Amino acid sequence: MRARLAALFLVLIVEGCVATSSSDGAARKPSSLPLGELLLVGFGGTQVEGNDEVRSLVCDVKVGGLILFERDARSGEARNISSPEQVRQLTSDLQALALLCTGRRLLIAADNEGGAVMRLSTRLGYLPTPPPQALGDAGDPAATALESRRMGATIREAGINWNLAPVVDVAVNPLNPAVVTLGRTFSSDPQQVIIQARAFIQGMHEAGVLTSLKHFPGHGSSRTDSHHGFVDVTETADLTIELAPYRALIKEGLADSIMTAHVFNRGLDPWNPATLSRFTIKRYLRGKLDYKGLVVSDDLLMGAIRQQYGVEEASILALQASVDMLLISQNQGRVERGAAERVIAAIRGALSDGRLSSKALATSIQRVRALRSRITP
């Protein structure tokens, strides 16, 4: 018992020292900005012990968050989640390591939309969950909130505090392969999307789980999937319809965070896809829609980005566009070794040559911290 108390006392001392020294970290000079907090990164392995990759990400890079996946995209084997007991131990150990090394907790994220996209899947012994399309078809927001609350309780029990859901893409194209044909969208009616997303978010909040609206400014009209390559929605997008859920949910204060889409729309930006577009994120989302919260990129290793840009260049462009947190999943069928470290080096270089502003990055870090402060104990 004494040894336990001594260990706890040591952790608290470390936490206090680190927290004190970094409490104003976002206001420091560029060279000492805690840039790792801008990263949400994936990793391999189902445990912390003996995992050098995890230790480096948490203790050296000091990432702001980690994202969990059930399966490895290359091998099909368990990546981070193999059983309810295992994932509880993993997330507990991750938080303990983060507390020891950084004095703060981690944002631990996963995609748990219900139905086809559910990292806590029935294969692992979890209860089945209805796809968003089924909830939208039923048209019963009370039932959606109840289902979301049940799902959220499971997510929180697993130690995941940030659910990258709900999808608020409007099903403009019934043959859309990215979200619509997979049952990931609530409806082709934007008002029904708003009603269902509101209920879903409220259920998650009641369970103590943060959420993320996705994929801004809309992926429901596309004919192709941005996981695999370039997606142009210039001729198919209907912004009046597709932006309605964001406009409503931002106004209601229900947008904990917003995830971007890697879709290109010449009507918004003639040069860059949404994730990398100042016109789309900074001018439209933050300007016209008056969104002040955290923006997280979709995975920067997806085909739509990877085939056109390197992860370093994409990261700089995303930050210039007013994205706050960069998602690097390391689970798109390939792994880029040292990607997190390379991105940090690229950001430092961009700060030095003036392509990035320390003031803007400090604001992004504050948004990450604001979201993290809402993690329930």
Language model regions located:
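Sec-dependent signal peptide recognition
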Residues: 2-8
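C-terminal motif of bacterial Sec signal peptides marking the signal peptidase cleavage site
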Residues: 15-16
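N-terminal hydrophobic targeting/anchoring segments and the immediately downstream early-domain regions
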Residues: 20-124, 326-328, 370
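Structural recognition of the beta-strand scaffold that forms the well-ordered cores
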Residues: 37-42, 64-70, 105-110, 116-118, ...
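Second-shell residues forming the walls of enzyme active-site clefts
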Residues: 49-53, 77-100, 192-356
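Surface-exposed loop and adjacent secondary-structure segments within mature catalytic domains
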Residues: 114, 122-134, 150-240
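Alpha-helical scaffold segments that flank or form the walls of functional sites
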Residues: 139-160, 242, 317-320
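Mid-to-C-terminal alpha-helical segments outside catalytic/metal-binding sites
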Residues: 351-377
